[in-house]
């Protein structure tokens, strides 16, 4: 009988500590990730712009 009381007390303690220490994650974190993906795409296009222009010029010379 004592074992069941101790086990239930430990379970309740773990449950209470888990509920208190679990801070809710902010909702805007998802939007920050989306913004980061968009920023990476934009930066990639800016860096690839000169290379695409050179390829376009090379194709026009080949015709």
Swiss-Prot record:
Transmembrane segments: none
Location relative to the cell: Secreted
Keyword annotations of the record: Amidation, Antibiotic, Antimicrobial, Immunity, Innate immunity, Secreted, Signal
Protein's UniProt keywords contain Secreted: yes
Chain positions with Leucine amide modification: 61
InterPro entries per record: Cecropin
Propeptide stretches in the record: 23-26
Principal location listed in the UniProt entry: secreted
Residues making up the signal peptide according to the UniProt record: 1-22
GO biological process: antibacterial humoral response; defense response to Gram-positive bacterium; innate immune response
GO cellular component: extracellular region
Tissue-level expression: Highest expression in fat body and hemocytes. Is also expressed in Malpighian tubules and to a much lesser extent in midgut. Not present in silk gland.
Protein's job: Cecropins have lytic and antibacterial activity against several Gram-positive and Gram-negative bacteria.
Similarity comment: Belongs to the cecropin family.
Protein name: Cecropin-A
UniProt organism field: Bombyx mori (Silk moth)
